[in-house]
């Protein structure tokens, strides 16, 4: 009878195909910083982060208040995620497997449930946003939204089937495209408001305590930061895992918070879909 023990060739091949979900990533499967950083940056380029920035931007002065909040908030988030990335790269284990060392078998199930539950909302938000974009910008009837949401949800989930390799190739396309799109939007917004001087003169919206602003910036992606270890574990060393994760969450997440806050401050609207429609 064919052997399927953990050390057999068949078992090792299956583990490699599934990206080692129940074991540490072996040395030969580790990835470089150049491969890992774009994946983690792509992970942070989440549409909900734009809305988070949109909630903060109109309520505070652009300089130095808003820039300071973005810097501090994303530094907190980045260091938190980077420390987890260091541990993940050092152990090679997934988020849930590492949770067993902290919370035990039963406790780790609760961790898995809580983090998994947040992803339901994450997918729901992203898929609904894509449907709204098509409604607003392409004139697709709202009666199609159910089908559109299902399509985009399964399209996003499909990357999990193909694992790291699919995320690697997708990030090479999606990250530059997202940066170009948001850069273009920021350029239009900057021209519309009359530069930084015009932005400084924009009337402030309802006041928002700095503690609440920091909570929004950090809290919007703290769950994602916790689960980023599922990718940072592929780093060849703890140092590389730390650097790749810090780059992604401090710069990548910070860029989206800044973009959402900037555009919301210019147009007085935190809804990025309506902002894009207004920009044409």
Regions of interest found by a model, annotated:
Residues 25, 29-33, 162-172, 223-255, ...:
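Hydrophobic, small-residue-rich membrane helices and short re-entrant helix-turn-helix hairpins
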């Amino acid at each position: 009878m064919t052997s399927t023990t953990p050390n057999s060739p068949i078992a090792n091949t299956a583990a490699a195909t599934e990206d080692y979900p129940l074991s540490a990533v072996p040395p030969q499967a580790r990835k470089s910083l150049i491969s890992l950083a774009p994946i983690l940056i792509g992970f942070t380029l989440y549409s909900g982060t734009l809305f988070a920035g949109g909630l903060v931007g109109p309520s505070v002065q652009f300089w130095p208040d808003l820039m300071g909040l973005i810097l501090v908030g994303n530094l907190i988030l980045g260091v938190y995620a980077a420390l987890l990335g260091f541990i993940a790269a050092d152990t090679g284990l997934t988020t849930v497997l590492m949770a067993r060392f902290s919370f035990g078998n039963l406790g780790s199930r609760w961790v898995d449930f809580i983090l998994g539950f947040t992803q339901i909302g994450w997918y729901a938000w992203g898929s609904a946003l894509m449907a709204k974009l098509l409604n607003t910008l392409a004139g697709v009837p709202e009666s199609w939204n159910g089908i559109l949401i299902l399509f985009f949800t399964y399209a996003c989930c499909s990357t999990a089937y193909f694992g790291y390799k699919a995320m690697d190739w997708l990030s090479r396309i999606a990250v530059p495209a997202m940066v170009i799109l948001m850069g273009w939007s920021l350029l239009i917004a900057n021209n519309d408001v009359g530069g930084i001087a015009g932005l400084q003169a924009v009337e402030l919206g309802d006041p928002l305590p700095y503690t609440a602003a920091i909570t929004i910036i950090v809290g919007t992606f703290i769950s994602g930061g916790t689960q980023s270890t599922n990718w940072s574990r592929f780093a060849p060393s703890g140092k590389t895992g730390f650097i790749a994760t810090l780059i992604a969450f401090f710069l990548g997440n910070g860029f989206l918070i800044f973009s959402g806050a900037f555009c919301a401050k210019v147009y007085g609207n935190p809804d990025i879909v309506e902002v894009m429609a207004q920009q044409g």
